[in-house]
Every structure is written in structure tokens, then in C-alpha cells.
């Protein structure tokens, strides 16, 4: 086989022949040095360097250095019969060619005539210099994979129409009519997916000006005959500068791509022997059809069409998507992409670009390449949706990062994964072609950029334990991940790796587009967790997710299973903590009615009746006894209301022995609320004796009983007594266990808020203890009987204070109970904003409530009576708030009218009244109540 060579610009012209083609025509075999250094090709292995798809090569032709483009003569249009004859003679010449370096002169002249006829400018009188052959650039393959080129000894004489001529059984006149239209179809395009043929005389690109079509430099795309040529891509397109020779016969025509008309490169795919239909040049003439030319001369397929327009990134991506969809959706043929990096890239002239990389011109100006997002199946996801590929093991670090899809680009442009039928599909087998393995082993420097493998921040919800942790980066996952986890709990749309080792190991099956968890129905959102799917993807936490039936069988408290809430009285399902004990609603109501109604229940048996869910109503006496044994007290509800106050156990080991029938849960709860002696407040059994020892001495009022009582003298004597008692309260509080642990400001505040309550409560105790509640015993020298009360100006107030000793008489309050209640009165009112030592205050108050329970148990031997007594005493403490409020109001009015009433107020008492009483009366304090009103 011989190659057609063009004449030099100054070679002798054939007599009577057509004009010689100019320098740089497609008939030249070896192109001269072009404007791009490093893009020289060789005869045997023409390796073309990658240059960008820029405007310099496609739109603006650049002549070779040192070449003067000659003017091309315009020839008249010849008839179709002349073209067919020339094509037949050219085919005969090629078939008879031997080792001669040039064809016969006659045939060469006829071939030149045919080429000058078909490739002439569209209009007469128009001339344009042809692009030099040295501007052979890297091919831009968008419609099929390619493999390393054939051995150098393979014949390289095929031109644009060589597939038509070399096909077995094909004659010069066979390609006519409709058959020719099917023969020019590309390999991956079926007749049902044909593009609409453009109308005659109309350009295929709207808005594109009609320009002359100079002769382009053709680059033949060679492909290897293999079974996987349509499923995977080779490392790089290898293009050879070929002669664009031959003319169409019987309707076939040589066409010029629009990109070549502006100085680009025409892609001439090599013949593939596997298919009966030949592969022709995927090029097209952009000029209108000449009047004397065959209709098929301008009806080549509009397959790879680069418009002669100033291309922007969006237009290029949109056109690429259109071209790729036309081929990749037909028959499942794979699509190959071999974009070149920009010219400014350091590797633009020598380093091959890995298959699947976009050029920088395909990105927005400020966009950073990110991880790839390839869908495995034909239903492509939105381009803006980023689904990070799962990294499987240490092999993932060897993978070269790939570019992220830009808006408008079809994911089918990436050849790494085959387009197959809908899911489910098995993982792809390891690649068997050396070209594909070379792509996976390409260094990261050949890629556009190194994308970080850190996942979205939108994917750190549920992670699975398998896989290596992702690398730390600017978008590293937060530290809330489980140890050793690298992906979400729900498998994302993972894709098989392109490396052989990762593909052999097998990747997680992709779940896109039908999201499902291990074959379960589709989830509504990715954060959903199905317990049935956890054994496959989330094994580390399965030990803590136990069925409810198993959890209820374990009576012990553990991390794995929380105890079921059951009533400690009857065993029914508990509704909450009522009166300090975990009980059901029925036992709660029963205990409240039994305690407030003061019923005297009697057991018909031996006080050992069974109380359960079925028989809890049989014996109310045993049910109430069990409630009290469990620790239910009416005051426990109030303790929970005030911030962090511990629930009080009505029966303690000191007051009552531990019952035998209390369940383990009740014992555990009782131990939780037992005060530890190792804390700051040392509450020991002789505490009541300590309270007795620090009780103040007898305080005298200094009233002169020899003189008749007047309103001013009596009130003045009471104020003097109040001043002395206030000093006594300060001294007593300093000796009170636990009070010095509070902040100094809290100590002063508590004394100022409670001094009136302590004074009137002491008055009631003295009246009850000394005169059995018949008179008001203010001091040994100031005792008011009922007659003196009536003569005083505050008789109504005396009747109010007289209620306290009468209650003591009614309840028969013991000294131990009084001492504990007195301490609780000191801790009975706090500011609205709380105290500085609020925690210590609550601990102290809870401790003295327990001491009151112990004091009650010293005299009350019955459990029921003890609980009722506690309720009555705490109810008395709550009633003191209203009584003391009346005293505050009278004291403040007297203080304001002290000069008019001639009543003297001591200095310290005056300061307390002026500073705190207005605040107390305005409701700016918080009384701590045991019971609701």
C-alpha cells in the first residue's frame, strides 16, 4: 500500500492537469513543524500531545512558521459522473499499489482534480489559506473508547472514505440511495436513533455564519479489535496525521467538519472489522450544498459538531451532553472522553491526560474540582448532587482523583463504568485490558487536580464500621463519628473502583436510583434507621439494641437495657414518680385519699395480704401500709417541684426497721435517696440533741408591768423584744449545722426573710409549753392574756398569732419536732432568682426534712400515723406564710407611722424592715410550700 503525497509548493506542475494542492493540504504525510512545540509526530508512533479545546485551534487558523500559504484556485463544479469515475480510478490505483512511493502521474492528477472539486470553497471568488498540516493536535474523542494504536507495520493509507473502499464486496457504485444513509451511521448509533439530516443549503448550527471550508488536517482514530472496546477506555487517544484523500462514489462525499474549517482537526475513525456496517468519517461539511453536487454530499451525520462560534463553558458542556446522550443511550455502548488540559498547564505539551478528566475550560472560573459522582446505572442523578464514592480499604489511596461533574455535563462522558440495564447488577469484574489498568495506575500529577476524599458534611449520619477512615481535610467529618467509621450508616451510592485490586475485592452494591437497605423497601429519608437492616451494616451497636421482650426480662439495671417502669405497690405499669415513689395512677389516688381523709383502715386478716394488680382493692389497710413502707409521703410531690430537691423517704432505717417484703427495686431507690454522712452536712442521730443544745436562752422584753398598758409602750416593748430575738436568731443560725456552708449573702438573705416567722413560731411554742396555749407568752415579763389582748390596739393581730399555740396543743407537737420545724422555717423563703449556693441550700433543706421524719418516728410507732403526722406538720408550716404576711403588713405600717404613734424601733430592726418588708410584700420572694393550696 502506498500513501499519496502532495506536491511541494514549487514542484513542477503536470501539464494539462489540475492545479497542485497547496502546502499543508491533507495529502502531506509528514507535517512540518507547527506552532505548538512538542507536538511533532513520527512515522511509526505518532504520539500527539494534549492541547485544550480552545479558540486558537478551532476558530482562528494559525499558519506554520516559515510557510507562506499559497492561494488556492477555485474550480468549477464537476458532474457527479466525473466524481464517481475519479473515485473508481483512485480505488483501482490504491489496490494496485506496491512499494512505489508515489502513484502514477495520471491517476494523481485525476485525484487532485477530484479533491480540488469537492474541497473547494463554497462560493466563487472566495479563497482562504488552508490550515497547515503541522497543526495536528490531540484528538477530541467523544463517541467511543479507543485503545493503543496498532503496530507500526499496519498499513496507514486509509483516508476519509477508506472504510467504504476496503470493505469486502463493496464496489464503487454500491453506495447509493438509502443504503448509503445506513452505511454512514456511526458504530454506536442505530437507524432508530439517527439524527435528523439537515436540509439542503441550510447550515446545521443556527446563527453560525457560512464560511468557506478549507482543507483540514485529518487525524485517524485507531481502535483495537477487542471485546471490551465499547465498555472501557484506553489511556489516551493516539492520532495519526492522515491524508484526506478519495472522493465519494455513487452519493458518498468527503466532508469537512466545521471545526476543521477554522483550523481544527478532522477525526477519521479507523475501520472496525467486527461490524458489517463501515465506520466513516464523523465529520460534516458546514457549507451549503453546491448546485451540481449529490444530495448525499452534504448529508453526513451531524455527530461531532463544534460550532464556529465563540464557545463558552456552558455551551461546550451542553453540546457535549447532547452528543453523549445520542450515543450512550443506544445499545449500552460506552462513551470515552479524552479531554486535554489547558495550554497553560505544565503537562499540556508532553504529559498524557488520564481518560475521564475534564479540561479547566469545562469548569467555572472559580470552581474547585471535587470528587467524582458517577451514577452506575442509566438513571442519572442531578449534576448538582454530590454522592461521594466509598473508599474501600487502603487501595483507595492509590486511585487518582477524578474531576467532579459540572452542570450540564452528562455523566455518560466518563468511561470508567459501563452503562448497563437497571439494577441489580453485580460488581464489575477486574479490567483485563492493559490500557484500562494503565489509566488506574496513572499518577496523580496527570489529573486535573487532587480532590480530597473527605465526604460531605451531608453524609456523616450513620456510619458503617467497615472501611478506612477518611482523610482529614477542610471538610473533614466532625468528631461525633463512631470510632473506626468512615461512611454513613446507610450505604451511599457507592461505585466500584477503577483499580484492579478494588474491583477484585468488590465494592458495596450501589443503591441509586432505588434507595433500599439490604433489599428492604425504599426509605423515605437517608437518616432513617431500620432495626432489621442493622445486622448487615451496623454491627458494633447491635449489642445495645435488644428486643423489648429481652429487656423486660432483666431485673437488673444495666447499660444495655433500662428497667421497665412498674409500680412498686401493685406491680402495674407505673405512670411516674408520685409522692416520692414510682407508682401507678391508681395507687397514687388511693394514697392521696387515704392520707387526706384520715381513714382508719383495718385488715381482716393478719396484715399480710397480697397487694397486686388484681387484688389491690381487696384490703386497703395492707395497700396503705405497703405505700408507706415504700416511702410514699404527701410532701414528696412538693420536693420535686422545687429545683432539684430530693424526694424524701418517709420511713428510714432509724425510724422504722426495713420491711421484709420490699422488692429489690424499692431498696435500690431507697438507697439512692439516703443521705450520705460523708457530705458537708454531718447528720448524725444525736442531731436533735445538738439542736436542743444550741437553742437560745430565755429572752426578756424589759416591759414595766407596774405601769398601765398603753399602745405606744406595749408596741415599744415588743420592738425591743424583737431586736433581741433577731440577735438571738443570728447567733443560733451560726451554730446550725450546714448553715455556715452557704454563701455569706445567702445567710443574710435567709435571716432577713425568715426572722418574723421564727419569732412568731417561737411565741407559739412558748405559749404552748408554758401556758398550754391559753395566753400569748412573748417573754417571762410580757404575757398577754385574753383581757389584755382586748385592751390592746392590735387585738385582731393577737387572735391571728394565738392560732399557732392552739395548733400545737391540738397536734401535741414534741420538742424534737419543733426544733426541726424551726430550722425548716429558716429555709422556707428564698429570692425569686434563687440563691448563690442553691445546691447546698437544697441539700441542707432536704436533710432537715428527713430529720423531721425521724423526729416523728420517735413517738409515732405506726407507719400510717407517722405519714399522717408528717402531712399535718408540714401543712402547718405552709399556713404560717399567710399568717406572717399579716404581721409584715402591720409591722411596716407601724414603722411608717412610728413618729405619729410614738413607737420606737431599734436600729437593726429598722434596717431590716425598711430593706426587706417592701420586697416581701410586693411578692418578690419565693415561699417554699410543701403542699398545694
Curated annotation (Swiss-Prot):
Motif (LXXL motif 2): 115-119
PANTHER family, alphabetized: KNIRPS-RELATED PROTEIN-RELATED
Pfam name, any one: zf-C4
Chain intervals with Acidic residues compositional bias: 220-231
Protein name (Swiss-Prot/TrEMBL): Progesterone receptor
Annotation: DNA-binding region: 567-639
SUBUNIT field: Interacts with SMARD1 and UNC45A. Interacts with CUEDC2; the interaction promotes ubiquitination, decreases sumoylation, and represses transcriptional activity. Interacts with PIAS3; the interaction promotes sumoylation of PR in a hormone-dependent manner, inhibits DNA-binding, and alters nuclear export. Interacts with SP1; the interaction requires ligand-induced phosphorylation on Ser-345 by ERK1/2-MAPK. Interacts with PRMT2. Interacts with NCOA2 and NCOA1. Interacts with KLF9. Interacts with GTF2B.
Keyword Zinc attributed: yes
UniProt region (Disordered), positions on chain: 1-256, 335-378, 415-452
Post-translational modification: Phosphorylated on multiple serine sites. Several of these sites are hormone-dependent. Phosphorylation on Ser-294 is highly hormone-dependent and modulates ubiquitination and sumoylation on Lys-388. Phosphorylation on Ser-102 and Ser-345 requires induction by hormone. Basal phosphorylation on Ser-81, Ser-162, Ser-190 and Ser-400 is increased in response to progesterone and can be phosphorylated in vitro by the CDK2-A1 complex. Increased levels of phosphorylation on Ser-400 also in the presence of EGF, heregulin, IGF, PMA and FBS. Sumoylation is hormone-dependent and represses transcriptional activity. Sumoylation on all three sites is enhanced by PIAS3. Desumoylated by SENP1. Sumoylation on Lys-388, the main site of sumoylation, is repressed by ubiquitination on the same site, and modulated by phosphorylation at Ser-294.
Domain NR LBD: 679-913
Gene: PGR
Residue numbers spanned by region Modulating, Pro-Rich: 1-566
Annotated Low complexity bias: 232-246, 335-356, 434-452
Compartmental location: Nucleus; Cytoplasm
Keywords associated with the record: Cytoplasm, DNA-binding, Isopeptide bond, Lipid-binding, Lipoprotein, Metal-binding, Nucleus, Palmitate, Phosphoprotein, Receptor, Steroid-binding, Transcription, Transcription regulation, Ubl conjugation, Zinc, Zinc-finger
Record note on domains: Composed of three domains: a modulating N-terminal domain, a DNA-binding domain and a C-terminal ligand-binding domain.
Any one GO biological process: nuclear receptor-mediated steroid hormone signaling pathway
MF annotations from Gene Ontology: estrogen response element binding; nuclear receptor activity; nuclear steroid receptor activity; steroid binding; zinc ion binding
Native source organism of the sequence: Pan troglodytes (Chimpanzee)
